[in-house]
């Protein structure tokens, strides 16, 4: 595996020059109708920058950032080792380090740094410990806490009716939004905090109702070098 956060130009070119069957499965392309944000379109733009044929600007960054990370493009991809979503993430991380960032990202990144949630203070501290130690820790996720807190209440009721010993933690965002906005260092800090708090809870199993958080815990944390302390 290439060094984390290192763009693989060969893989970008493989995608850029492919017949692009994946374009049929890209939800961003289906909604926008813009070839520039099709999987191969984004790969072409990123490859051009990597070869110094183009330089980053807000228009290019906006196009390359139009990726949901759904990985639908991998289903029909003829290159088994190509993960375009990761290559685009690496590109955005490189852009951020070079000082390029979309203004719309900055308020959310600042909220993550200050409150541990992209939504700001209104979600900070909403999930607090209800038991010192338990077999199960329930992780609500910052989007749930901000937009649908009733999901947390319902999950607690289910766990209690099932007789499950559970706890909540004063959770931070899982870190995936920070990665998608190019700040891998911040994503790693959030991951480290969550791993510490979960380990301190004494739980052996983590349950979450957020699919994005589940994917981040199961796939991104190991990739970032964090050993997740529970199943």
Locations of the language-model features?
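Ferredoxin-type iron-sulfur electron-transfer modules and their immediate structural context
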Residues: 1-64
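Iron-sulfur-cluster electron-transfer modules
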Residues: 43-226
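Short, intrinsically disordered, charge-balanced linker/junction segments flanking boundaries
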Residues: 227-231
